[in-house]
Amino acid sequence: MDSQARIQANLRHIQAFEAKPNPKALPETAVTRGFEKVAFPKLVRELTCDNAVVRKKSLLAARELLSSPVNHVQCVAAGATPAIVALLQDQTDDETRYYAAGTLKLLAAKEVGARDLAQHSGLDALAAALEDPSEGVRDEAYGALIEAARFDSTRRALEACGSGAVLPRLMELALLEAQGGAAGRAQQGLVLLFTCTQARHNAGILSQLVDVAQAIPHLAGLLKPELPMPVRHAAAELLGALATREDAKIQAVQVGAVPLLLLAASPSVPVPFATSAVAALGAITIRREGKYAALESPGGLAGLVSVLDPCHEQLCINAMTAVSNVAEAPEARAILVASGAGPKLQHIFETATVEVVKRAAAQAIRQCRFKHLPYEVLPGAPPINEE
């Protein structure tokens, strides 16, 4: 091949690689990845654009970024929270609200996101979304609030929301969901309220629920055997938290909560539900009224004895606490002994390897054997006259 032919072949080779069509323009609704720090302002820009399809895609993109701790902080710093909260209030599109509520659940997974959510009225927006016509939006809103309420700052913010009207309204909504057959959302509502009661300073929250919402009689109604187990479990858990107040203990006895709780003191009941119910009994039976309500419930004390099983440690501790409380009533001690409490407690005391279980068993043994003052020496403790 002469030089001219080689030149022509080379030109054809170059033309073959140069003759490419221009890249096609992307459609208006295409969402492309932004790299490094460009991604976060771009995300906020797309969340606030005029195109509904782009906004939905941006909400899904935000979930991907929020799943990374480093990116989570940068999303918050870029201003994603108010943009997502605004989309949660978009009354024109159920799907947008659904995506927004689910994205806020991821945002609230970290305390920095939960705090930012509270600062931009996100908690009020989520509380309003609990009454959304779309069931999917309500489900996601409950999930987001439960996630945010893991932090004490959010619990305090929820207490103050709506001038103190949000938590009582949550109690009403939980009842409405239970009556409507939506057991899952009713349970979520009760779990959210229980989480709020775990605030470091919870006197205001308890007051809103006990005094304003009149939660005690409602919770007693939710303990009825015909209701779904998850609802009864969540109701027992919340009742135990509210029963830290003395007037709530008395009210729980008056509305008949004690016999309903004792129904859960059985080996046939799922352990988590039994654990919560017996814990609530332990709180209520501190009062004299609670002791005699348990004593007068048919088969109630035998039920407590039946769950004295060290295989389920927390349930066993709760049951021994309740037994110790009830045994302060003289009439209860004979019934407990007849139900076989003595040998069970002694076995737990002798075989326990955890100090808190051993101490709870010792307290229950001493209380069941009590005849007169002064108290006998606690089992396992050294004699009083020893140095």
From Swiss-Prot:
Keywords: Cell projection, Cilium, Cytoplasm, Cytoskeleton, Flagellum, Repeat. InterPro entries: ARM-like, ARM-type_fold, Armadillo, RSP14. One of its GO terms (cellular component) is cytoskeleton. It is found in: Cytoplasm; Cytoplasm, Cytoskeleton; Cytoplasm, Cytoskeleton, Flagellum axoneme. ARM repeats lie at residues 24-67, 69-109, 111-150, 154-198, 204-244, 245-286, 289-328, 330-370. Belongs to the flagellar radial spoke RSP14 family. This is Radial spoke protein 14.
